[in-house]
């Protein structure tokens, strides 16, 4: 991937203040670059290259995998949920790639703030749109409750998204999504004790989905493993790259659960009261 001679890279102390968010990554920072210079950084080694490619390759894979494995012809009136699911799967890696690729733009902190907001929007979309099919299927046989639950979760997501966009730190952004996670756990619990419905194998996928996402967030906040060896993980294997890989796994688990859930909802007949 890295086969061009790049510019002279900066150390942490020489990098712009808005890029000094991980004091344990000591080297490999790109200098301020034009848009074309940012694109050129796809082809030389720097400390954001792993972040760009982990989500860039995932995005390309999801663009093929998610629409092709969605049984559109069998979803009937629930086809819109297939569309929201596709957006939920594609938004996080798309926002992430743009953020990491252009974060060294010569526009400085103003451009960086917009890119960070775009990245957070991707996370907000997967947390919001990703849960709608889950709630829809869990409450498939409770039509009086389902609309209220969908609207309530959407409103909650709007509040969480705003808090994440205005959060002053990585840990604050992680906490901003806590209420959404709690709401999803409530839905999972309802399904687990028989108060909700859905495909039999989907619930374990959803539990793994949130477990991977939470683990990735905690690793990123803790700055592990680079905290144990500052400078040793500047290019490969640092906490943010680990979080990226775990988030890809989380999205795959979401997809593995939603597809059978939507198929189940399309063919299941609820018992009459």
Swiss-Prot record:
Induction: Expression is up-regulated in subcutaneous white adipose tissue of obese individuals. The keyword Hydrolase does not apply. It is found in: Golgi apparatus membrane. GO terms for biological process: protein stabilization; regulation of ceramide biosynthetic process. It holds the Pfam family HlyIII. Belongs to the ADIPOR family. Relatively widely expressed in a range of tissues. Expressed in subcutaneous white adipose tissue. GO terms for molecular function: molecular adaptor activity. This is Progestin and adipoQ receptor family member 4. Keywords: Golgi apparatus, Membrane, Transmembrane, Transmembrane helix. The chain crosses the membrane at residues 52-72, 79-99, 115-135, 147-167, 185-205, 245-265. Its main location: Golgi. The gene is PAQR4. It comes from the Eukaryota. Interacts with CERS2 and CERS5; the interaction regulates CERS2 and CERS5 stabilities and activities and is inhibited in presence of ceramides. Plays a role in maintaining adipose tissue function through the regulation of ceramide levels. Mediates the stability of ceramide synthetases, CERS2 and CERS5, and their activities. GO terms for cellular component: Golgi membrane. It is a multi-pass membrane protein.
């Amino acid at each position: 991937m890295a086969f061009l001679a790049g510019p002279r890279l900066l150390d942490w102390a020489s990098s712009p203040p808005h890029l000094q968010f991980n004091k344990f990554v000591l080297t490999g920072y790109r200098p301020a670059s034009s848009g074309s210079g940012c694109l050129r950084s796809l082809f030389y080694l720097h400390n954001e290259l792993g972040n760009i490619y982990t989500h860039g390759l995932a995005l390309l894979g999801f663009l093929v995998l998610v629409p092709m494995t969605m049984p559109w012809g069998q979803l009937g009136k629930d086809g819109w949920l297939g569309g929201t699911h596709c957006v939920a799967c594609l938004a996080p890696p798309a926002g992430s790639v743009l953020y990491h690729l252009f974060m060294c733009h010569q526009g400085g902190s103003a451009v960086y703030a917009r890119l960070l907001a775009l990245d957070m929007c991707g996370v907000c979309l997967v947390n919001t749109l990703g849960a709608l099919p889950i709630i829809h299927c869990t409450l498939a046989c409770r039509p009086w409750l389902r609309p209220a639950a969908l609207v309530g979760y959407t409103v909650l997501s709007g509040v969480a998204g705003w808090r994440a966009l205005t959060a002053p730190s990585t840990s604050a952004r992680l906490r901003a999504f806590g209420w959404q996670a709690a709401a999803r756990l409530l839905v999972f619990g309802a399904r687990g004790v028989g108060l909700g419905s859905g495909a039999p194998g989907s619930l374990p996928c959803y539990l793994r989905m949130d477990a991977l996402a939470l683990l990735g967030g905690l690793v990123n906040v803790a700055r592990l493993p680079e905290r144990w060896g500052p400078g040793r993980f500047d290019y490969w294997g640092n906490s943010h790259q680990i979080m990226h890989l775990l988030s890809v796994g989380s999205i795959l688990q979401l997809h593995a659960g939603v597809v059978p859930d939507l198929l189940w909802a399309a063919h299941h007949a609820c018992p009459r009261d």
